[in-house]
Amino acid sequence: MSKPNRFPVKRIAIDAVLIALYFGLSWASVEIAGIKLTFVGLASIIAAMVYGPIDGFLVGFLGAFCEQMLKYGFTATTLLWLLGPAMRGLVVGCAKLIFKQAMATENLLKNHRPYVFFAVSIFAGLLVSTLNTLAFYVDAKMFHYYTYELIFGVFWLRIALGAASSLLMALVTLPVLAGVQHTTLVPKKVRS
């Protein structure tokens, strides 16, 4: 008897499309003085909610890797810059496994009370902002790119924008999940 395939071709193809979405959204980001207003996390949140933490992690990691390679190239701190986006998908996916009832797709859409999902998305955004600040700090120490004032002077603004953009991404994710419910792209056992 053969083992069931954990990553069928269709699932890998959808992850690839979400990685491309991440990369495309990264070019629509606005970066001003150490603050980045972006919605790239939308792709990893969708992957995490549809397929789970592994896919959410991979979409965030590989999407950020493509962005890093084409915008900045490979440096000693590249892995630090990839950690934040990858953790967003991992946190949302793990929260979906832990809070099965509250974060089940049907419950999010039918009960119209996605408070746990919003809280998890905001927490993930705060984590990403904090990890990116750490990457800024390590970059500043290694390469003297940024000043202490630039890194930590806008920290609270970076945190506030991270929380706000995460809430907006969570709001956009709900209609996407509603659309996914009615497709054959996602197996029924994954939809809940």
Tell me what each language-model feature is.
Residues 1-192:
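Loop-helix junctions at membrane interfaces
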